Each structure stands twice: as C-alpha cells, then as structure tokens.
Amino acid sequence: MHVEITPADLIVYADENLISQVVINLLKNAIQAIGNQPDGKIELKASCNDMEEIWIEIKNNGPEIPSEIAEHIFIPFFTTKEGGSGIGLNISRQIMRLSGGSLTLLREKETTFILKFN
C-alpha cells in the first residue's frame, strides 16, 4: 500500500470516528478487489486543491467495476459479494454528505473512490 499526503499538515474538520469508518470501509473493499493478485496495489492520496478543498483518493488496480454495477453501488442493499450486506458504500456516502462532503467513484484504468471535503 502506498500513502501520500500533500501537504503533510492537512486538517479535515469532521468527526474523526465517522471519517475513519468511511476510509476503513473503502480500504477493506480495495483489499477484497485486488484479492490475491501478485501485482495488486492500493494507494491512498490526500491533497488540497487551489479552492482549499481536501480530497482523499483511495485507488486499487483490481478488476474494473462494470458500468451496470457501478451505477448501483451506492444504493442500499445492492451487493455483488457473497455474504455482503450492500450497505457499506451507502453508509459511507451518507457520512460524507453529513460531514459536508461527497463520495464518488471514478472508473478509469483503476478504481478510485474520492472523498471530497469542501
């Protein structure tokens, strides 16, 4: 796992326990996505843009999420995992909204979840 925080003194004004729950959920999903891939990688990057918005990106190089699944992943109880509850991403998105931020999925070569704090 690769972690990059720029600048090193980023401060997010939000409930630490709730945001930790979101990050842990996304990291667990990333670990499951890469499975036993020998070249599997997870990256966590935190940064601040020119508008002073803080972005936390959690990226993995597991299998691509198909469009028909991606459009449903934030819906409560939607899951493709055996034994999964389908509430993790929905709760994570609700936590981010209550914290004045957002949680989005970016699908390119790798799967990236972006937490944005305004």
Please identify what each model-predicted range represents:
Residues 65-76:
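Short conserved segment of the HATPase_c
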Residues 19-20:
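A residue-level detector for a conserved hydrophobic packing site
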Residues 39-52:
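Short beta-strand/loop element within the Bergerat-fold HATPase_c
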Residues 60:
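Acidic ATP/Mg2+-coordinating residue in the GHKL
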Residues 1-10, 49:
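Conserved catalytic submotifs in the C-terminal HATPase_c
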Residues 100-101:
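Conserved glycine-rich
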Residues 88, 92:
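Short alpha-helical Gxxx[C/S/T] motif in the catalytic ATP-binding
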